[in-house]
């Protein structure tokens, strides 16, 4: 006997295509950076010695450069630019030739005498007249700036004078006045024919002082 069959047909949707991508591909940026075109200019390197120049520059420093403070050096430079006023000195004696009779008498008696003297800035300039008692002669100034604790002999220069006769000779001198000098004193020594003759202003010596320090003679030896 024929049987009855029932058929149930199930229709499923077609399979969807699957795409596989690696994790690295999913992290790649979507923007691509723009590249700049290469610079057509080339860079050249040239060393100094190729141009005839020195490869190194050397500067030498002294120890004083590191020892001195910059501020001290700057202040010293400013002080050097400050104008300084020169001190004024006054002679403590009258010009010897002011009393010409006494001047001639002393020249005859002592054979040596201060003739002229004047202060010229930071020095004292003058002339000395001596009697010509020999061919070889020497005239010096004996000077002291500290009351004869120390003294110095300053040679004088012979002056050739054709207007005078041969009985006298003249010598010139220029005595410096160092910075800080307040008083100075000098006398004159004339050496000729093995003998010494002195002009010491009759035992007082010739002296001068800086203005504002007072007039007075320094105590010391007299020749």
Swiss-Prot record:
Domain of life: Eukaryota
PROSITE patterns (UniProt xref): CBM21
Protein's UniProt keywords contain DNA-binding: no
Keyword Lipoprotein: no
Quaternary structure, from the entry: Interacts with PPP1CC catalytic subunit of PP1 and associates with glycogen. Forms complexes with glycogen phosphorylase, glycogen synthase and phosphorylase kinase which is necessary for its regulation of PP1 activity.
PANTHER family, per the entry: PROTEIN PHOSPHATASE 1 REGULATORY SUBUNIT, PROTEIN PHOSPHATASE 1 REGULATORY SUBUNIT 3C
Entry function: Acts as a glycogen-targeting subunit for PP1 and regulates its activity. Activates glycogen synthase, reduces glycogen phosphorylase activity and limits glycogen breakdown.
Domain remarks in the Swiss-Prot or TrEMBL record: The N-terminal region is required for binding to PP1, the central region is required for binding to glycogen and the C-terminal region is required for binding to glycogen phosphorylase, glycogen synthase and phosphorylase kinase.
Protein name: Protein phosphatase 1 regulatory subunit 3C
Gene: ppp1r3c
């Amino acid at each position: 006997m024929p049987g009855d069959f029932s058929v149930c047909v199930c229709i499923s949707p077609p399979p969807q295509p699957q795409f596989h991508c690696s994790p690295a591909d999913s992290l790649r940026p979507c923007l691509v950076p723009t590249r700049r075109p290469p610079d057509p200019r080339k860079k050249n390197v040239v060393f100094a010695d190729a141009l005839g120049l020195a490869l190194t520059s050397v500067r030498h420093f002294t120890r004083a450069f590191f020892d001195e403070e910059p501020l001290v050096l700057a202040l010293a430079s400013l002080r050097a630019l400050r104008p300084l006023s020169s001190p004024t000195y006054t002679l403590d004696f009258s010009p010897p030739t002011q009393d010409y009779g006494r001047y001639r008498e002393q020249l005859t008696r002592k054979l040596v005498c201060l003739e002229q003297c004047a202060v010229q800035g930071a020095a004292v300039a003058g002339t000395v007249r001596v009697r010509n008692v020999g061919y070889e002669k020497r005239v010096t100034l004996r000077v002291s700036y500290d009351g004869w604790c120390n003294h110095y002999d300053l040679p004088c220069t012979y002056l050739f004078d054709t207007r005078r006769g041969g009985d006298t000779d003249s010598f010139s001198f220029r005595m410096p006045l160092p910075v800080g000098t307040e008083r100075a004193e000098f006398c004159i020594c004339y050496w000729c024919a093995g003998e010494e003759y002195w002009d010491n202003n009759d035992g007082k010596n010739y002296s001068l002082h800086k203005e504002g320090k007072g007039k007075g003679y320094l105590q010391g030896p007299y020749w």
